[in-house]
Curated annotation (Swiss-Prot):
<dbReference type="Pfam" id="PF20772">
    <property type="entry name" value="TACO1_YebC_N"/>
</dbReference>
<dbReference type="GO" id="GO:0006355">
    <property type="term" value="P:regulation of DNA-templated transcription"/>
</dbReference>
<dbReference type="InterPro" id="IPR048300">
    <property type="entry name" value="TACO1_YebC-like_2nd/3rd_dom"/>
</dbReference>
<keyword id="KW-0805">Transcription regulation</keyword>
<dbReference type="InterPro" id="IPR002876">
    <property type="entry name" value="Transcrip_reg_TACO1-like"/>
</dbReference>
<comment type="similarity">
    <text>Belongs to the TACO1 family.</text>
</comment>
<keyword id="KW-0238">DNA-binding</keyword>
<keyword id="KW-0804">Transcription</keyword>
<dbReference type="InterPro" id="IPR029072">
    <property type="entry name" value="YebC-like"/>
</dbReference>
<dbReference type="InterPro" id="IPR017856">
    <property type="entry name" value="Integrase-like_N"/>
</dbReference>
<protein>
    <recommendedName>
        <fullName>Probable transcriptional regulatory protein Suden_1389</fullName>
    </recommendedName>
</protein>
<dbReference type="InterPro" id="IPR026564">
    <property type="entry name" value="Transcrip_reg_TACO1-like_dom3"/>
</dbReference>
<dbReference type="GO" id="GO:0003677">
    <property type="term" value="F:DNA binding"/>
</dbReference>
<keyword id="KW-0963">Cytoplasm</keyword>
<dbReference type="GO" id="GO:0005829">
    <property type="term" value="C:cytosol"/>
</dbReference>
<dbReference type="InterPro" id="IPR049083">
    <property type="entry name" value="TACO1_YebC_N"/>
</dbReference>
<dbReference type="Pfam" id="PF01709">
    <property type="entry name" value="Transcrip_reg"/>
</dbReference>
């Protein structure tokens, strides 16, 4: 099985969990996309993708529409995408992606969480080559789909891997090919269920159950922060 497939299996256990945390994070992504490219999803590919991902997490239509409207409000602060790299106990490494309207606050909060749990922030770029950045798409397997034919049709758009599990097709490519692969799927009238940019560790490590629990606690605290969007690790 390919790495995108393995990533998806692991992501079934993702910790975002509570809707009270999840929907505001998704709302930020929608608002930023609408603010940058306009409020019409048909004319704004990034917004279209953000809405698809929100719907995949069962975010109510009213919440999605409210997030789009916030983009045109004069009271809505500009959002900034920032990332942090960190090392934690047991050889764990973190790539922390955030979206914030106050970078000073976010830096302080993330650093405080890391320090309290025996982890430390690293210089930007320290882990850049420890993670591959991939675009991952999911869509339903239809009766008339032939995966081998589909693979051949999508190679020119940058396709690297294609897998299927339980009626869901997972495809991946280098993050730079996100737009071309997304467009190819849309041109083929394939309805995308999810589309995300992910960071995959080039050399994943294995931990004991107790070590895993230690790292999970740190990740939970990081993801409790309203500005933290995703935490990627090098844990297998």
């Amino acid at each position: 099985m390919g790495r995108a497939f393995e990533y998806r299996k692991a992501s079934k256990l993702k910790r975002w969990g509570a809707m009270s945390k999840l929907f505001p994070k998704l709302g930020k992504i929608i608002t930023m996309a609408a603010k940058e490219g306009g409020s019409d999803p048909d004319m704004n590919a990034r917004l279209r993708t953000a809405i698809i991902n929100a719907k995949a997490e069962n975010m109510p239509k009213d919440n999605i529409e409210a997030a789009i409207k916030r983009a045109t409000s004069k009271d809505t602060a500009s959002m900034l995408e920032v990332s942090f790299e960190a090392k934690a106990p047991h050889g764990a490494q973190f790539f922390i992606e955030c979206m914030t309207d106050n970078n000073t606050r976010t830096v302080a909060n993330v650093k405080n969480i890391l320090t309290k749990h025996g982890a430390e922030m690293l210089t930007k770029g320290s882990l850049e080559f420890m993670f591959d950045r991939k675009a991952i798409f999911e869509f339903a397997l239809k009766d008339n789909m032939d995966l081998e034919e589909l693979e051949l049709e999508l190679i020119d758009a940058g396709l690297e891997e294609i897998e299927e599990e339980d009626g869901v097709v997972i495809i991946s490519t280098d993050y730079k090919n996100f737009g071309s692969l997304n467009s190819a799927l849309e041109d083929m009238k394939i309805e995308i269920i999810k589309a995300n940019l992910e960071r995959m560790a080039t050399s994943p490590i294995s931990l004991t159950e107790q070590q895993q629990a230690d790292i999970e606690r740190i990740i939970d605290k990081l993801e409790d922060d309203e500005d933290v969007q995703k935490v990627f690790t090098n844990i297998a």
